[in-house]
Amino acid sequence: MPCPSGGHKQWVEEAILLPAEFAKETALFFSGLYVQRLQERSFFMYGYWSKLCRVDLTNKTWKAEDIKDEDLKLLLGGTAFGCKILLEETPAKVDPLSPENKIIFAVGPIQAAKFFPGNAKWSVITKSPLTGTFMDSAGTGAWAPQLKKAGFDALVIEGKSEKPVWLYINDNGVEFKDAADLWGLDSVETSAKIKEILGDKRINALNIGPAGEIMNPIANITCDGHSFAGRGGGGAVMGSKNLKAVAVWGTKECPIADAEGCDKWAKEMFQILHKATETAEGTPSVMTGMEEIGDSPIRYWRGDVWHKGAETIGTPRYTQVLNVKPLPCQNCPVGCHRHIDITLKNGEKLVGNGPEYETLGTMGSGLCIDDLEAISIANDICNRAGVDTISAGSYIGFLTECYEASLISADKIGMVPHFGDPETLLFLVDKIVKNEGIGAYFKDGIRGAAELIGGDAGLEALPRIASRQELVRADLSRRLSVIA
């Protein structure tokens, strides 16, 4: 995607076709409704049930608790409320993988709307096993509106089950289910199996794959097999509690302040977003533009330009080669996710989620790999195992750089790694998701691996982390040098 003469800001606005005045009106609309709620009924918050569901896995019990009005007024949104719970209820020095750590799933008022872009978002908040500090991550799917329909604004899970278990939350409360038949299944298989058990394909479930079960520090949480709360290791926390999945289905309607006005505004947003040319091809459509403005990492943050490679893995070629179809979340016209259907070189079929921009950045430009088939296979391995692709790709880039700097031998890695080599990607991603071989070096994350590999020298070879976690695919320093 060429960068227009107006520069970065113009490119962003043109890419999403969301004029500044419309964004301002949207903000005023929501803030206006919020103020209206406070002025009209200080004791009642529209869009909320003022209820959380607290689950004790150790004792297999649950209870509904009231949420204080002042908390809802102060903390508009699921993430903020989850942060408050974690701060107040979790000891500062708690082991993230101990029963004393809590994992909180929360939604905001917008999830009460029947028809509104963005209401598929849910947040997970816990103490991260990767960073050792607070984490929040967000996913999508129909799970968030269903939690609201079940009568809850948040779900707080504490303790640890003696045996693998999964939860089914509905209008009547919480059911504890034996997860023996689910343990060991990948994230896609788990989602399908739960639908089969409950006899309803509409039911969404958050679940972990095998990586979460072995408490891999970069294990993610999957929703319905196609959306991921990827960062921070939330899947490892679920695994530490022997919690395989949380399914939810509800039929209750949470009151909102102005249902008619909300529906009207949602339709206007849909019309505007449907006109956006980039929504037709999802997040891969930004690959070439991000590389051109210097925002995409190249060669594990050491490279500068990769024009041809970005064009090779970005759209429109991405759409054509991978036989792409949109995979939108509930009530969202943007359609970030892509569904792919391809026949691999070995004759096997690969059908499922296609790699999005962050994955193209970490496993494509970040490793200088322009092979869409290899990137798609690696993406599928991570998705099914339940692993964050950003961290996994960063691990591979780091290992390759350490090998080139003679900090680690090919024998220890299990192969001779190279940038631009699809085989390096496929070999190492398999080791990383399983914590096997060289993958076991990352049992404490990339910083721990750096210390194991080269001590101080290993740490010096370790760029671009924050609080022990790898950065997203946005190279600010490179962008500034390109713009300058």
Task: Give the ranges of each region predicted by the language model.
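Leucine-biased recognition of intrinsically disordered, low-complexity hydrophobic segments
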Residues: 17-18, 28, 33, 38
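Extended C-terminal regions of large enzymes
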Residues: 195, 202-206, 210-232, 238-484
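Protein-protein interaction/assembly regions in multi-subunit complexes
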Residues: 43-235, 240-307, 316
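Charged/polar low-complexity intrinsically disordered segments
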Residues: 13-14, 23-25, 39
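Residue-level detector of intrinsically disordered terminal segments
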Residues: 8-10, 44
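Residue-identity detector for glycine
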Residues: 6-7, 32
